[in-house]
Amino acid sequence: MRGILLAGGTGSRLRPVTWAVSKQLMPVYDKPMIYYPLATLVSCGIREILVITTETEAAQFQRLLGDGSQWGLRLEFAVQQRPGGIAEAFLIGEEFLAGGPVALMLGDNLLHGVDFRPCVQRARETAGGHVFGVAVADPSAYGVVEFDAAGRVLSIEEKPVRPRSPYAVPGFYLYDADVVETARSLRPSARGELEITEVNQAYLRRGALSVTLLGRGAVWLDTGTLADCMRAVDYVRAIDEGQGIKIGCVEEAAWRAGFLDTAQLRALAEPLMSSGYGQYLLALTGDGLSRTPQWPALTAAAG
């Protein structure tokens, strides 16, 4: 399975900050925002990833991330010429995907406290689409998934006025190879975009959409506004200062996934020692702990 990391958009809700820098390059505590979703993909065992950006910001992302080889990854880059919707990512990445399954993650989403590997492995082996559900206070601001007592998906709607469930769909999606043709069949919405919710609805109509609910201990932060960004900073800082854990550390995720050996991790730590980030990486190599983080199991799966 290959990954797509969508880091396009104009960041209009964060202006004037985003006049000068991409939203996904803004710092969230001690690292760029893009590190957090990238680390999630890497922690799932995905090492071939296409980063989709705007044309004006492509060089900045390439300067930050390089080709990924320093982390044992293979990163490629592509441009979304205008805001064409999340689902357009599958058309942009068609050649990169090479007819295989895909994990798509939005570059402004932070997910923590969940082991997604079982779901990713299942998606590698089975046909269909897979989304996640997180209970939120105001689901009307998000895509919302509804399901019955048996766990079957009944509906999925984008920002409904009257939500049919409290479960929002975060920006992490798993699909089989059919997603490219599904996206190609869509018509632009009223705002001129190919909507990810319509992709999910197409899978639902075929009886091929499943959902996994993220339970207690799972954290989802969508950094769409400045207030959201500050909440993300507060959360990352609290975990760092309280538990000594750096969320969204790509180097650590790659090491734990087996993409880097310990000597390579130490080498990455050296030029970062003055910031404290390097000291954290160096400490990992001698902590005597298992490389595999122990996250709570996903609480419910439906299909």
UniProtKB/Swiss-Prot annotation:
NCBIfam families noted in UniProt: rmlA
Annotated GO biological process: biosynthetic process
Function comment: Catalyzes the formation of dTDP-glucose, from dTTP and glucose 1-phosphate, as well as its pyrophosphorolysis.
Alphabetical UniProt keywords: Magnesium, Metal-binding, Nucleotidyltransferase, Transferase
Residues reported in the UniProt entry to bind Mg(2+): 108, 222
GO molecular function per UniProt: glucose-1-phosphate thymidylyltransferase activity; metal ion binding
Disulfide feature: none
The UniProt record lists the keyword Flavoprotein: no
Family according to the record: Belongs to the glucose-1-phosphate thymidylyltransferase family.
Broad EC category: transferase
Stretches of the chain forming a coiled coil according to its record: none
Record protein name field: Glucose-1-phosphate thymidylyltransferase
Keyword Magnesium among UniProt keywords: yes
Cofactor annotation: Mg(2+)
Pfam families: NTP_transferase
Gene: acbA
Gene3D superfamilies associated with the record: Spore Coat Polysaccharide Biosynthesis Protein SpsA, Chain A
Cofactor note: Binds 1 Mg(2+) ion per subunit.
Catalytic reaction annotation: dTTP + alpha-D-glucose 1-phosphate + H(+) = dTDP-alpha-D-glucose + diphosphate
E.C. designation(s): 2.7.7.24
Organism this protein belongs to: Actinoplanes sp. (strain ATCC 31044 / CBS 674.73 / SE50/110)
InterPro entries referenced in this protein's UniProt entry, alphabetically: G1P_thy_trans_s, NTP_transferase_dom, Nucleotide-diphossugar_trans
